[in-house]
Amino acid sequence: MAYSFQLGLQDATSPIMEELMNFHDHTLMIVFLISSLVLYIISLMLTTKLTHTSTMDAQEVETIWTILPAVILIMIALPSLRILYMMDEINNPVLTVKTMGHQWYWSYEYTDYEDLCFDSYMIPTNDLKPGELRLLEVDNRVVLPMELPIRMLVSSEDVLHSWAVPSLGLKTDAIPGRLNQATVTSNRPGLFYGQCSEICGSNHSFMPIVLEMVPLKHFENWSASMI
């Protein structure tokens, strides 16, 4: 989860988030090299009086600055397209959870079970227990099995919302009348926090998301106790 004065991304918890962080580093390296080259050339132009009168007419230079940007864009686009396909691909999910956004709470329905559904509201600051996080705790957590593919169906009952859990690399728009889907796969157990990431009204900041990833045996025990 995030912490005060954090400079980097949250620790990756899913394969998709790991790929996104690798892509971020890959792209940042390319941008850094280009920026360094541009700054070096600018500094040379400002500090020296050297000129090359035939530069603008050189066929070789024109060829280089046409082909090189195209190659750089391809180097950025190919990993990006690969990750986009990964995010859209859902292979044999073991569980489907339907998530509905409301003003201003989330409701969840485990569609593989007959009567397993609940609403999830933020816990007010006055009701927090020692060690709990302000504006991030909920009264009903979403309990899911770890290391298994889970399909999340996301929609909304009223206005636009966005269901986002950064450490899992998830951000899916909740649009009234439309179902969007995302894949949830956690590499380890734990609590993972998120929030609504689409301005949806006066209490937009009070729509936290808490996923509790547990081993499959614990999930089966929890689901049996909820039915």
From Swiss-Prot:
Residues bound to Cu cation A2: C196, E198, C200, H204
Top-level enzyme category: translocase
Top-rank taxon: Eukaryota
Record-linked CDD domains: CcO_II_C
GO cellular component: mitochondrial inner membrane; respiratory chain complex IV
Cofactors (names): Cu cation
Topological region Mitochondrial matrix: 46-59
UniProt-recorded name of the protein: Cytochrome c oxidase subunit 2
Provenance organism: Praomys jacksoni
Gene behind this protein: MT-CO2
